[in-house]
Amino acid sequence: MTTVRTRIAPSPTGDPHVGTAYIALFNYCFAKQHGGEFILRIEDTDQLRSTRESEQQIFDALRWLGINWSEGPDVGGPHGPYRQSERGDIYQKYAQQLVDLGHAFPCFCTAEELDQMRAEQMARGETPRYDGRALLLSKEEVARRLAAGEPHVIRMKVPTEGVCVVPDMLRGDVEIPWDRMDMQVLMKTDGLPTYFLANVVDDHLMGITHVLRGEEWLPSAPKLILLYEYFGWEQPQLCYMPLLRNPDKSKLSKRKNPTSVTFYERMGFMPEAMLNYLGRMGWSMPDEREKFSLQEMVDNFDLSRVSLGGPIFDIEKLSWLNGQWLRDLPVQEFASRVQTWALNPDYMMKIAPHVQGRVETFSQIAPLAGFFFAGGVNPDAKLFESKKLSGDQVRQLMQLILWKLESLRQWEKDSITATIQAVVESLELKLRDAMPLMFAAITGQASSVSVLDAMEILGPDLTRFRLRQAIDLLGGVSKKENKEWEKLLGAIA
């Protein structure tokens, strides 16, 4: 009997997302329920955005939750390397195999040519897609351009008629017309693969038997199925999990809710409660009880109990469930966990240099730096009253800073400072008028340690969370303002 092997394959391009943890949990439970193996693979082919720091955060977040893997970049295994950036030669080999078999082809189109192609198609009312012009090149022309070292990508051929039947473990057979599929790029000009080629090659070579992924990937499933067919490989069984959603039913995103696992760890949530809550996202125990452990979920796991309705990720409900877990702890363990959370040595070492020179006794630390250990800070609305800025200007400033910080790739003091400075200058304001407002939003106080240092230490999710709280305190942002201010956002350097 074949051993069940599942995997999670996140991209290390930002904070570890609760959606990644959710999909990892269901893959883990499915594998363990069947006595199988759960694998961690890192999809880091986006070299511009991928970082080892983000990769380590993924490791830390999953381990904090209690989701462990038997093979991966940090523990090794018989099917490595487990970072896609280290498997380039493997992908080159299989991309060339597809070309040799006539299932893929080199495309020499420049970005300008592709832009013009799409513009012309849109002008005709057509769906923009690659038109296959490289297929018209003669073999001699292709060989000449390849020999000359001309930059090119490798694209896959796709049928233009009929439908692809996608066998989904939750929905049954799903029919998707082939004419919705583009001639997907498989290998980029830099020699690295796109998601589609790397995904299929890795899953095959690593012996993955079942793939549980988010339903956002269902529309592109025919490309993966076609690649398995082209290679002559047996494809894994596919399961497309319902997406996590905000309380307003929109797709879960950091613009409306904190989405980083690290945020919830920093807020003092228990990993058991977090896993418990993620386990209830579209799934339920046979006896319908709300509180259960990871092992209990594994023991009772059955995909037939997954509901296709979009599960709502609600922080208030998560907080309620976390309270159930906290109150069930023995008092001694409760005290121990509080100490571990509040007096984390690494975190304290980040804070200490900014506090030590400002206090005369230890008792003065809490009033000065207590905000480092809080979730929200609930500032007094009077702290946002400005002699130079109107109430609308304050809200606009805070909202634009929040949006710009959401796209910040490197969370460091210098980049945070530059971001705030850029917003302030774009609104023709003075930094000295803006910073007291940031103090109020981030620390809940009129003054404290450097707010820029504090933002760096608190991290992106807690910082953004507090900015959102401040904006809500001041009345929020209307749909009209949201639309108008987003136009300003694009002009900020």
UniProtKB/Swiss-Prot annotation:
Which EC numbers does the record give?
Answer: 6.1.1.17
Q: Coiled-coil ranges per the record?
A: none
Catalytic reaction equation(s): tRNA(Glu) + L-glutamate + ATP = L-glutamyl-tRNA(Glu) + AMP + diphosphate
Q: Which GO terms describe its molecular function?
A: ATP binding; glutamate-tRNA ligase activity; tRNA binding; zinc ion binding
**Keywords, A to Z?**
Aminoacyl-tRNA synthetase, ATP-binding, Cytoplasm, Ligase, Nucleotide-binding, Protein biosynthesis
Q: Where is this motif: 'KMSKS' region?
A: 251-255
Superkingdom, natural source: Bacteria
Record-linked Pfam families: Anticodon_2, tRNA-synt_1c
Please state where this protein is localized: Cytoplasm
- Look up the record and give one Gene Ontology term from the biological process aspect: glutamyl-tRNA aminoacylation
Keyword Metal-binding on entry: no
GO cellular component term of the entry, any: cytosol
Renumbered ranges of motif 'HIGH' region: 10-20
Family under the similarity heading: Belongs to the class-I aminoacyl-tRNA synthetase family. Glutamate--tRNA ligase type 1 subfamily.
Q: What does this protein do?
A: Catalyzes the attachment of glutamate to tRNA(Glu) in a two-step reaction: glutamate is first activated by ATP to form Glu-AMP and then transferred to the acceptor end of tRNA(Glu).
According to the record's subunit comment, the protein's assembly and interactions are: Monomer.
| Name of the protein this chain belongs to | Glutamate--tRNA ligase
Q: Which organism is it from?
A: Pseudomonas fluorescens (strain ATCC BAA-477 / NRRL B-23932 / Pf-5)
**Classification lineage:** Bacteria, Pseudomonadati, Pseudomonadota, Gammaproteobacteria, Pseudomonadales
